[in-house]
């Protein structure tokens, strides 16, 4: 079954200078349990697309369906509940700098209404999974970039999501740290059967971790398919840049 289905999604922004069409009739199907890459140059529309997947950005037109349920038809309370099933990690980690590592991971569970003891127990389990159990009482300023991203991953898993969206999650990291984060994401995918969507401009990330990929240019998807097929037999000019 399709975990995520994007149907003819367009997104237009208006400004004093005029309108900008960030997405143009994008359609995409991502199956349950796979690691799916979306790649393109800066300004291709990748981040806008991933933000439409959890309705942080509402499409100007088109539909976003999660397990067959259209997000556009949900009331605000239903949408908040649906978003609990969609974790997200970012390039710059977005951690609460005045809170400890443990409290950062607890934060989304507090928002859910979980009791402190329950939240802390789960946060400790998640920190063990991401290899940071000994850093529970540290603060983000005391961590390396890779460690910060591991905290962000643990926090994203706190609500037991079915989907994890990764927006340029490794682009601020060195190659060795990137490799360790990708291995962690693969482990999480296997352990929890979470569908992972990776937004990146790094071909090495797609080759390392993704089974399928969509290539974007100027707000459109120009090519989709399995990673092996796409890069063995590229059809688009954009794809040729990556092979």
Positions of PLM-derived features:
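A short, proline-enriched helix->beta-strand linker immediately N-terminal to the Walker B motif
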Residues: 158-162
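ABC ATPase "signature
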Residues: 224-225
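Conserved ABC ATPase signature
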Residues: 139-143, 147
């Amino acid at each position: 079954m399709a975990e995520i289905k994007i149907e003819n999604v367009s997104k237009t922004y208006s400004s004093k200078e005029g309108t900008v069409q960030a997405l143009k009739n994008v359609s995409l199907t991502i199956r349950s349990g796979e690691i799916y890459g979306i790649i393109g140059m800066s300004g291709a529309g990748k981040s806008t697309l991933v933000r439409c997947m959890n309705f942080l950005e509402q499409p100007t037109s088109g539909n976003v369906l999660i397990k067959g349920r259209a997000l556009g038809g949900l009331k605000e309370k239903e949408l908040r509940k649906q978003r609990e099933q969609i974790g997200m990690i970012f390039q710059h980690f977005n951690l609460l700098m005045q809170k400890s590592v443990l409290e950062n991971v607890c934060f989304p569970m507090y928002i859910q209404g979980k009791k402190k003891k329950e939240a802390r127990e789960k946060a400790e389990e998640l920190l063990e999974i991401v290899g940071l159990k000994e850093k529970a009482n540290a603060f983000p300023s005391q961590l390396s970039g890779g460690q910060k991203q591991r905290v962000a991953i643990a926090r994203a898993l706190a609500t037991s999501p079915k989907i994890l969206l990764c927006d340029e999650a490794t682009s601020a990291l060195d190659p060795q740290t990137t490799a360790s984060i990708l291995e962690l994401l693969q482990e999480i995918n296997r352990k929890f059967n979470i569908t992972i969507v990776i937004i990146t401009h790094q071909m090495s990330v797609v080759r390392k971790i993704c089974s399928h990929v969509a290539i974007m240019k100027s707000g459109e998807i120009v090519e989709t398919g399995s990673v092996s097929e796409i890069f063995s037999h590229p059809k688009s000019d954009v794809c040729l840049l990556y092979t």
